[in-house]
């Protein structure tokens, strides 16, 4: 599903929230991100500031959390001290391989991971919403610098 302002508005209204200009602007930023790019709250704040969109950092944090709870964004732990976010596109499942030294992140697809997630959630009586695997390791470049 591709999220639009209309679908976001409908989802928010269903849950008793409204589509504010700030929420719509944040959604637009994520829709326009290049594939494979993830933003932290601070990254998003700086991006919006550079576009003269004065949205406070606290509003950004609240909006990111809300959109993640609603399933519009995926919250990612990319081996840094803060979360990153990306647009959740259910038909584009992918996983992350992260270097713990330099934070380089590679996205990859694996039908096996998705099948295991689906099978496990079904076995336990869960309805699968998302399935993601994050692998932490040391990239080849950082391995060479450790020698």
Curated annotation (Swiss-Prot):
Gene3D superfamilies attached to this UniProt entry: 3.30.1490.190, Winged helix-like DNA-binding domain superfamily/Winged helix DNA-binding domain (1.10.10.10)
SUPFAM superfamilies associated with the record: Winged helix' DNA-binding domain (SSF46785)
Region entry Dimerization, spans: 91-147
Keyword flag Metal-binding: yes
Region called DNA-binding, residue ranges: 1-90
Compartments, record wording: Cytoplasm
Example GO molecular function: transcription cis-regulatory region binding
Broad class of where this protein is predominantly found: cytoplasm
Any one GO biological process: negative regulation of DNA-templated transcription
GO cellular component: cytoplasm
Binding site for Fe cation: 93, 95
Any matching Pfam family: FUR
Binding-site residues for Zn(2+), renumbered to this chain: 38, 86, 96, 99, 102, 107
Alphabetically ordered keywords of this record: Cytoplasm, DNA-binding, Iron, Metal-binding, Repressor, Transcription, Transcription regulation, Zinc
Similarity annotation: Belongs to the Fur family.
Record note on quaternary structure: Homodimer.
PANTHER family tied to this protein: FERRIC UPTAKE REGULATION PROTEIN (PTHR33202:SF19), ZINC UPTAKE REGULATION PROTEIN (PTHR33202)
Entry function: Acts as a global negative controlling element, employing Fe(2+) as a cofactor to bind the operator of the repressed genes. Regulates genes involved in iron scavenging or photosynthetic electron transport.
Protein name per its UniProtKB record: Ferric uptake regulation protein
């Amino acid at each position: 599903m591709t999220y639009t302002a209309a679908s976001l508005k409908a989802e928010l209204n269903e849950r008793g929230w409204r589509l504010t200009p700030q929420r719509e602007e944040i959604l637009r930023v994520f829709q326009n991100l290049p594939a494979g790019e993830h933003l932290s709250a601070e990254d998003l704040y700086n991006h919006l500031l550079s576009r003269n969109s004065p949205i406070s950092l606290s509003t950004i944090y609240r909006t990111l959390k809300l959109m993640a709870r609603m399933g519009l964004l995926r919250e990612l732990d990319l081996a840094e001290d803060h979360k990153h976010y990306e647009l959740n596109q259910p038909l584009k499942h992918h996983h992350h391989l992260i270097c713990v030294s330099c934070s380089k992140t590679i996205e990859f697809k694996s039908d096996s991971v998705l099948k295991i997630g689906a099978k496990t959630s079904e076995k336990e009586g869960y309805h699968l919403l998302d399935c993601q695997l994050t692998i932490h390791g040391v990239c080849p470049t950082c391995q060479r610098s450790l020698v």
